[in-house]
């Protein structure tokens, strides 16, 4: 089980990303638009730098919904390999069978 503070920190980052998504997208569009003047693009970059660091999507860590584990994360299911194995052994994931050969 991951520390509650780590999970909460990540949840706070997700919230910030949602809150600043539109503003960040608009500023990036201005900054990357080569048809605009260099000064205008530079100002957009400065405004982008003033946004909170945690409002960037790259700072979000994929974590298991059940345990908060940050590694061995299956995106399709939203859980870690450990949680996947536990649920699979209990028969709670349809179509998942233990392999044997």
UniProtKB/Swiss-Prot annotation:
Gene behind this protein: rpsN
Gene Ontology cellular component list: cytoplasm; small ribosomal subunit
MF annotations from Gene Ontology: rRNA binding; structural constituent of ribosome
Coiled coil (residue ranges): none
Function field: Binds 16S rRNA, required for the assembly of 30S particles and may also be responsible for determining the conformation of the 16S rRNA at the A site.
Entry keyword set: Ribonucleoprotein, Ribosomal protein, RNA-binding, rRNA-binding
HAMAP family reported for this sequence: Ribosomal_uS14_1
Assembly description: Part of the 30S ribosomal subunit. Contacts proteins S3 and S10.
Family that this chain belongs to: Belongs to the universal ribosomal protein uS14 family.
Name of the featured protein: Small ribosomal subunit protein uS14
Any one biological process term the GO annotation gives: translation
InterPro entries the record matches: Ribosomal_uS14, Ribosomal_uS14_bac/plastid, Ribosomal_uS14_CS
PANTHER family: 30S RIBOSOMAL PROTEIN S14, SMALL RIBOSOMAL SUBUNIT PROTEIN US14M
